[in-house]
């Protein structure tokens, strides 16, 4: 059997990004997944992006990942969320045509250099002396490899719940993986349970659209990927309805039949994506909850009713659907359900996503306690890059809180772990003014180029964009008007007799790109995305100065690497409790050590002094 450098187990959103990233770095990569038709499957809602999540997608794209480009081949309803608020919290989002998304993903992966795909099931992993040796398929055959990336999604001992009915499955009509759960336990990983859910799917032909509110997308779709010039997929509307008092009464009368409330489910569900049962119980004073009716495709009559995830019995689901305006005669095509699955404590992995127990074993996606396609994909690309770099004996690729949302997510997980499905939010980032969706490529693409994970095409596009930014910035600094002339135009500026450039004007409240173009028509010929970027940078300029100072302080501590072989028990001024925490978590930088709960500032000072006296420098050994 051929030996591979990297084997990725699982073809979901984490798996496809991991496999593609590994292959881009030139190492032989094998992606193992049960079915060809499920590559990049959208198991839950047919959408990519959102608040914070959209920034994750842009970061994946900046590292030459797949998700942003694929959604641009399948997006049927683009919407910039939070646009009435500051640019730091804007959330690009797009509804997807499920069929087009899978088709585009399949076409890319099956033609990817250095990547092979095997449609099979993995039963076990062969490990010797705490190092990866091979994967073992369910037919007993072995495939040798150097590195393994586990991206198992909800398949680890997956169990679907519909009322009192239990169905062993990783997804509808797909078998779970018990073998890999057993493997992880045998290795010594502690497995816990999480839960997620999905709503019933509805036949759109049976909806009364006169009773629901139409929700159009943006007039001009803004692509996710820097590789996309224009979105050519037909755009369609979504719709909004809401629950009623009658809906709530049906749910309350049947709470004891819900798998969530009968005690049948052990796993903890996502706090910020609660089931409809949870909403009725936790927000009992609310008389209604919004439901977004999302088409699953241009030529697909299936509707995803976002907002009514449930584990109620199927017959109760039929009752509650008929109490919702516009859905009185709606037909359910597939019932909603909850699904439980195993995950590991993400403090068992490092910031490269390699496990601390086993050299060459990486975890990405829901196995680490996250929820969401974008969170999974962000981990997948990092795991794929690091597995390939390790094969090539090159330094690891570390994203930090200061340069990316992906870095924030990984740092949160590896520092604190999680007891519930982790979802990304803008509020999790202390540097969100500088790590926005609009500048993801400026933050990360150069890093990707330096390690060789960026294609020549993207490199060329990035180089041209950087030159255009500089030339546009020069133009904006050249175009100017006197304060008196601006006052005559109704623009409120201090009358100090000076000239104000366009970049100066961008700092004025309520002055925007459209006004600049009206005053200086030459700007019509400039790339609007670049104008928006420079507008945002100018608008935030004074805040960014302070934030960059904070980032510099962070990076100085981030640069203080802690040797892998450090013995914390030899630092006498640190308490035994803190020594044990540091030994367990194995932080690789001073910043990581500082973020471990219970590690005091005095302990950090003691570590820094110890490193200076023991190693006489800041380099890892």
From Swiss-Prot:
PANTHER family: GLUCOSE INHIBITED DIVISION PROTEIN A, PROTEIN MTO1 HOMOLOG, MITOCHONDRIAL
GO terms (BP aspect): tRNA methylation; tRNA wobble uridine modification
Subunit structure, as described in the record: Homodimer. Heterotetramer of two MnmE and two MnmG subunits.
Domain of life: Bacteria
Annotated protein name in UniProt: tRNA uridine 5-carboxymethylaminomethyl modification enzyme MnmG
Family of the protein in this entry: Belongs to the MnmG family.
InterPro entries: FAD/NAD-bd_sf, GIDA_C_N, MnmG, MnmG-rel, MnmG-rel_CS, MnmG_C, MnmG_C_subdom, MnmG_C_subdom_sf
Matches recorded under Pfam families: GIDA, GIDA_C_1st, SAM_GIDA_C
UniProt binding sites for NAD(+): 269-283
GO MF, any single term: flavin adenine dinucleotide binding
Residues that, per the record, bind FAD: 10-15, 122, 177, 366
Cofactor(s) the protein requires to work: FAD
